[in-house]
């Protein structure tokens, strides 16, 4: 497909990146998926995404939330590939697809009219993938456009762009190749305001794995000031994307339909609840402890239902919703007017912090991090690189060495619930913590291990994801991982409202769960002492001024320094690796020797692993990683590998205590070194006695002392048996060496002497199994066919 045939109507957004060129994003509609309420094809380069928005006919009155669903369908044909699964078709969504769903949902959800209860589904299908252009940001814009066309009560359009900081400049929609040179990668979504400004609605950002190296080479570190400048730099691109979407909507959008809106409560219910319980709620919100505070609020709720139930019969849900709204109002008012939070802290105060490492036995690394009632256990496991995760997605990455898993069991909030496979929220939190630490991880060469980090949220009252960042840093250092710098994270909140005719914003440091629920923003920031490594912004507003976000970044920086001090008091440098962790040794061999180390059908490498107890992983460039839980096993495996691929070549006259590995009619093959065999001819086997059958003297597995008699031009080795002193010379050559058809009769045997020093030329038999100097016997007469 090309841009010209993707739809009947189309509009284009052109974004100028100066020296980095222009990016053209095209929105087309009217040809594909015409039965959906709204559909659009968005294209960037050769990346093509189809977005279809549909809406349920009947509202779900029983729901007390907006039933919006976003699905991303990664089609492997988009990259010209067949799925690697058993059934050769796409199955459950990949982690990349789930994270893209969350990227789309976060700016989209607050843009719908409040109280909408009709089911809305947005399905994104990746039809074609340009290796240079990721599909995720294209999908956000496509979702906004298809929803704008659908006739739903939607306040969009929403524009989204990826911004990369490259050579001191911010580049919109960078290619994969350009991202290799970036110190910071940021996805920003927002909407254009009537005054021409842009309100930021969502941010997902991280430093790259190359950041530390690039900064050491002179690039600008992604400090709070640099990140804030990136938010400003994203505005022109967002404005242009919103313009193109608005123009297409003017000619192709359906009229906005009337949908029933279900308010949580009516004004009379709210007024009755406020008159009865406002003072009690205000007192309850002064209780610092979460459990005690919630218990007091539950008592107030029970009294409200009891006292007002008869008056509002059948409307008990309204009373509960009104009480929640009253609680939210009191929390926000107290912060805005008195600068006092639920637990009595000021806007910049952090809850009590504790950090401890080495809390579990036997595991490779462990740590416990607590911030108030939020408690995270971090556990680190190290293994061979062959245990890294293989990826079968549309992403250009095919494996992942660092894996971060986040678990949020129901008991962490004192509740019951389902325990099992991770939900989208858990996948998203784990990915955020993973991205926060990737920039400070050692390279494969510096630390040749696969690393799995697990964060167990044992207690939750605000920002378990940022607690996971702190616990992970501690756990990794406890396991002996040489991080380039420790990383800490903090969650920031926002309360905003009209106060004396002006909009006032108060940024909160280290938010509680209730402040997250009642506030306007969840802004998570992670980083080192020097720069930001990851951040994530979710908002319930239509947008937040960028200067407010810039101030929040600076406030987060101050909090991060405090947390890092507590963490460094627990552990300052990487600890000694656990006795239970594998020790990995690196061996470099010539690429053409890889096959020798592996052996036929893996026999050689399997034998080394079985006999030494070590694990061996071989890279395509000839790097071999040898891992074992004890030093002698690893050293034995390294010596075996070196003997094969980096050997000290044997010389004529060298003696070995070898092992018989194969017998034939003409002699025995003796293993001298791993991968190095020699032929002990039948005439040399019997210590001067005539030998009719090799097996009468030697069998597979027998040990025999031999001396190298000759090495021919092809490297094949011929052996003499080392005989005890005074023993007779070897028997005459085997009968198979005599010309056929001659009868010796009773003639005395002819003394042929010892032929060990005779030039053998290329007569050495070939074993045929890849070993040195081996093979089957051959007839003397050969016919050459031309």
Swiss-Prot record:
It is an enzyme of class 2 (transferase). One of its GO terms (biological process) is mRNA catabolic process. InterPro entries: ExoRNase_PH_dom1, ExoRNase_PH_dom2_sf, GPSI/PNP, KH_dom, KH_dom_type_1, KH_dom_type_1_sf, NA-bd_OB-fold, PNPase. One of its GO terms (cellular component) is cytosol. Residues 582-641 form the KH domain. It is found in: Cytoplasm. Residues 722-786 are annotated as: Disordered. Its EC number is 2.7.7.8. Residues 727-738 have a biased composition (Low complexity). GO terms for molecular function: 3'-5'-RNA exonuclease activity; magnesium ion binding; polyribonucleotide nucleotidyltransferase activity; RNA binding. The keyword Nucleotidyltransferase applies. It catalyses: RNA(n+1) + phosphate = RNA(n) + a ribonucleoside 5'-diphosphate. Its main location: cytoplasm. It comes from the Bacteria. Mg(2+) binds at residues 516, 522. Its cofactor is Mg(2+). Residues 653-722 form the S1 motif domain. Keywords: Cytoplasm, Magnesium, Metal-binding, Nucleotidyltransferase, RNA-binding, Transferase. Residues 739-778 have a biased composition (Basic and acidic residues). The keyword RNA-binding applies. HAMAP family: PNPase. Involved in mRNA degradation. Catalyzes the phosphorolysis of single-stranded polyribonucleotides processively in the 3'- to 5'-direction. Belongs to the polyribonucleotide nucleotidyltransferase family. This is Polyribonucleotide nucleotidyltransferase. It comes from Salinispora arenicola (strain CNS-205).
């Amino acid at each position: 497909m090309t841009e010209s045939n993707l739809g009947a109507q189309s509009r284009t957004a052109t974004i100028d990146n100066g020296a980095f060129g222009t990016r053209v994003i095209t929105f087309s509609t009217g040809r594909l998926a015409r039965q959906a309420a709204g559909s659009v094809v968005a294209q960037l380069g050769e990346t093509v995404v189809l977005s279809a928005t549909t809406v349920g006919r009947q509202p779900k009155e029983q729901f007390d939330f907006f039933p919006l669903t976003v699905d991303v369908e990664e089609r492997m044909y988009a990259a010209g590939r067949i799925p690697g699964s058993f059934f050769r078709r796409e199955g459950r969504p990949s982690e990349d697809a789930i994270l893209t769903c969350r990227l789309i949902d976060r700016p989209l959800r607050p843009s719908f009219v409040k109280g909408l209860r009709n089911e809305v589904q947005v399905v994104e299908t990746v039809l074609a993938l340009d290796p240079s252009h990721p599909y995720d940001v294209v999908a956000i814009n496509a979702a906004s456009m298809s929803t704008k066309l659908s006739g739903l009560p939607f306040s969009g359009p929403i524009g989204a762009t990826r911004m990369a900081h490259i050579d001191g400049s911010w580049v919109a929609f960078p290619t994969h190749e350009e991202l290799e040179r970036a110190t910071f990668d940021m996805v920003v979504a927002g909407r254009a305001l009537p005054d021409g400004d842009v309100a930021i609605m969502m941010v997902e950002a991280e430093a790259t794995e190359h950041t530390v190296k690039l900064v050491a080479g002179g690039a600008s570190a992604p400090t709070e000031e640099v990140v804030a400048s990136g938010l400003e730099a994203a505005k022109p691109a967002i404005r242009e994307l919103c313009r193109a979407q608005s123009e297409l909507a003017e000619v192709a959008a359906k009229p906005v339909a009337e949908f029933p809106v279900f308010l949580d409560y009516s004004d009379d219910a709210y007024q009755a609840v406020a008159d009865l319980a406002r003072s009690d709620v205000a007192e309850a919100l002064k209780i610092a402890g979460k459990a005690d505070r919630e218990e007091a609020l539950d008592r107030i709720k029970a009294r409200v239902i009891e006292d007002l139930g008869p008056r509002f019969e059948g409307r008990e849900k309204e009373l509960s919703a009104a009480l929640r709204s009253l609680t939210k109002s009191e929390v926000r008012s107290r912060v805005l007017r008195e600068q006092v939070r639920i637990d009595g802290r000021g806007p910049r105060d952090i809850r009590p912090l504790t950090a401890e490492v080495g809390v579990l036995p036997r595991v490779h690394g462990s740590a416990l991090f607590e911030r108030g009632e939020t408690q995270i256990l971090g556990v680190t496991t190290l293994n061979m690189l062959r245990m890294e995760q293989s990826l079968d997605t549309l992403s250009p990455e095919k494996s992942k060495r660092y894996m971060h898993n986040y678990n949020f069991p129901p008991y962490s909030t004192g509740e019951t619930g389902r325990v099992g496979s991770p939900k989208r929220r858990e996948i998203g939190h784990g990915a955020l913590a993973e991205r926060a630490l990737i920039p400070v991880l050692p390279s494969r060469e510096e630390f040749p291990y696969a690393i799995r980090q697990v964060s167990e949220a044992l207690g939750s009252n605000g920002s378990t994801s940022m607690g996971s960042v702190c616990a992970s840093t501690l756990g990794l250092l406890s396991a002996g991982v040489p991080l380039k710098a420790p990383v800490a994270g903090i969650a920031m909140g926002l309360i905003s409202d009209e106060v004396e005719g002006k909009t006032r914003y108060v940024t909160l440091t280290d938010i509680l769960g209730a402040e997250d629920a009642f506030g306007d923003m969840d802004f998570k920031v992670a980083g080192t002492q020097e720069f930001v490594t990851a951040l994530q912004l979710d908002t319930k507003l239509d947008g937040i001024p960028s200067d407010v976000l810039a101030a929040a970044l600076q406030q987060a920086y101050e909090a991060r320094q405090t947390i890092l001090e507590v963490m460094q008091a627990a552990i300052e440098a990487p600890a000694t690796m656990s006795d239970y962790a594998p020790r990995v040794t690196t061996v470099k061999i010539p690429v053409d020797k890889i096959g020798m180390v592996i052996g036929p059908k893996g026999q050689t490498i399997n034998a080394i692993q079985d006999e030494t107890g070590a694990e061996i992983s071989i890279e395509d460039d000839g790097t071999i990683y040898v891992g074992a839980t004890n030093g002698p096993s690893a050293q034995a495996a390294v010596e075996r590998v070196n003997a094969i691929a980096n050997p000290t070549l044997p010389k004529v006259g060298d003696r070995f205590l070898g092992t018989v590995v194969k017998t034939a009619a003409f002699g025995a093959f003796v293993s001298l070194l791993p991968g190095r065999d020699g032929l002990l001819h039948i005439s040399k086997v019997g210590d001067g006695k005539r030998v009719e059958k090799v097996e009468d003297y030697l069998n597979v597995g027998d040990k025999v002392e031999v001396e190298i008699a000759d090495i021919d031009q092809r490297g094949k080795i011929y052996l003499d048996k080392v005989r005890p002193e005074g023993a007779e010379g070897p028997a005459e050559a085997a009968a198979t060496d005599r010309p056929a058809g001659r009868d010796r009769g009773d003639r005395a045997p002819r003394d042929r002497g010892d032929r060990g020093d005779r030039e053998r030329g290329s007569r050495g038999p070939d074993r045929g199994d890849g070993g040195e100097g081996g093979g089957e016997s051959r007839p003397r007469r050969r016919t050459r066919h031309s």
